[in-house]
């Protein structure tokens, strides 16, 4: 069976790797210590500290497994340029109705974070912008209507 690739920017890959390393450290030391201390309190059947630590251990182990799976399938997107918008590029766009300018980064769905202006290439905005060049005007359909944007700049 062919492995399904997960495309990530270099920044996205490094972020997931750092989270994995942090969780492994936490699981190995902090949670193990909490479980040990809770065991020392006695009867485990009614020991809420023990149960809470074991539950957290399970959640962390599941996330570690998820991250290891993602990273094993990861392909880092490289070779970006500033001629055409692609995954990983930062894009300066201007709303032609309001004049508002905004810088967003086109990323993979795994890295999307609208609060930090990281927009998935699979989103309505991402689908319209990928492949476009500076100066082009695009129409983006959103729940609140259709918006016209001009692409002012592309950065790596």
UniProtKB/Swiss-Prot annotation:
<comment type="function">
    <text>Necessary for efficient RNA polymerase transcription elongation past template-encoded arresting sites. The arresting sites in DNA have the property of trapping a certain fraction of elongating RNA polymerases that pass through, resulting in locked ternary complexes. Cleavage of the nascent transcript by cleavage factors such as GreA or GreB allows the resumption of elongation from the new 3'terminus. GreA releases sequences of 2 to 3 nucleotides.</text>
</comment>
<dbReference type="GO" id="GO:0006354">
    <property type="term" value="P:DNA-templated transcription elongation"/>
</dbReference>
<dbReference type="GO" id="GO:0003677">
    <property type="term" value="F:DNA binding"/>
</dbReference>
<keyword id="KW-0238">DNA-binding</keyword>
<comment type="similarity">
    <text>Belongs to the GreA/GreB family.</text>
</comment>
<dbReference type="GO" id="GO:0070063">
    <property type="term" value="F:RNA polymerase binding"/>
</dbReference>
<dbReference type="InterPro" id="IPR006359">
    <property type="entry name" value="Tscrpt_elong_fac_GreA"/>
</dbReference>
<dbReference type="GO" id="GO:0032784">
    <property type="term" value="P:regulation of DNA-templated transcription elongation"/>
</dbReference>
<dbReference type="Pfam" id="PF01272">
    <property type="entry name" value="GreA_GreB"/>
</dbReference>
<dbReference type="InterPro" id="IPR036805">
    <property type="entry name" value="Tscrpt_elong_fac_GreA/B_N_sf"/>
</dbReference>
<dbReference type="Pfam" id="PF03449">
    <property type="entry name" value="GreA_GreB_N"/>
</dbReference>
<dbReference type="InterPro" id="IPR036953">
    <property type="entry name" value="GreA/GreB_C_sf"/>
</dbReference>
<dbReference type="InterPro" id="IPR028624">
    <property type="entry name" value="Tscrpt_elong_fac_GreA/B"/>
</dbReference>
<dbReference type="InterPro" id="IPR018151">
    <property type="entry name" value="TF_GreA/GreB_CS"/>
</dbReference>
<dbReference type="InterPro" id="IPR023459">
    <property type="entry name" value="Tscrpt_elong_fac_GreA/B_fam"/>
</dbReference>
<dbReference type="InterPro" id="IPR022691">
    <property type="entry name" value="Tscrpt_elong_fac_GreA/B_N"/>
</dbReference>
<keyword id="KW-0805">Transcription regulation</keyword>
<protein>
    <recommendedName>
        <fullName>Transcription elongation factor GreA</fullName>
    </recommendedName>
</protein>
<keyword id="KW-0804">Transcription</keyword>
<feature type="coiled-coil region">
    <location>
        <begin position="6"/>
        <end position="75"/>
    </location>
</feature>
<dbReference type="InterPro" id="IPR001437">
    <property type="entry name" value="Tscrpt_elong_fac_GreA/B_C"/>
</dbReference>
<keyword id="KW-0175">Coiled coil</keyword>
